[in-house]
Amino acid sequence: MKKFAILFSIIYCSVFCNTLYSQNISDTVKDVVISIEYDKVCDEFHYVAEIKDFFSSKYNKGYSDERYGSYKYYEELHNEAYKEAIRNIDSRKMGTFIYSFIPDKHKRKLGNQGWGFIVFNLSKTEGLLKYSLTIRADEGIKVGRIFTKDDCLNIFHALDTSIFNSWSEDIDYLTGAIKFRLQDTD
């Protein structure tokens, strides 16, 4: 099971990376997207499976009639958990991709304020619907609406020519969040 998940993650990431490199995107953005969560498919699968009570632990991974009733039901749970794991990782990639478009002046202004979150809802047909950037610091600093109209147009263009093209046909809507560490710019 673990070997299959690792093999699938390598194939999935290779296809994703090839799609990105065939598009007209800056090397910086490509590096950001490609480097995020490269080998986390297996871990994410176990996380999702445990939440859904599909696996009781990382060490109890096998099928049993007693636990699942039928192998068909086991396969359904497995496929559902795996699909959700891939979707979660897609969400993280997308969040990182969007974060890479934040203007440097805003990154400098934020400075070393702790952890931040970018939350987004995306649709193939509607583009970037909603986003927010929250900085968690001692003072509870919150920063929002940091993209200009031109920034948004650049994001939409990059999404249209790269990420959306790599999505499965049946995925029209994606929502999620990316947590990032703000770097000290001094």
Where do the PLM segments sit?
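Bacterial Sec-dependent N-terminal signal peptides
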Residues: 1-30
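Charge-biased low-complexity segments
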Residues: 23-186
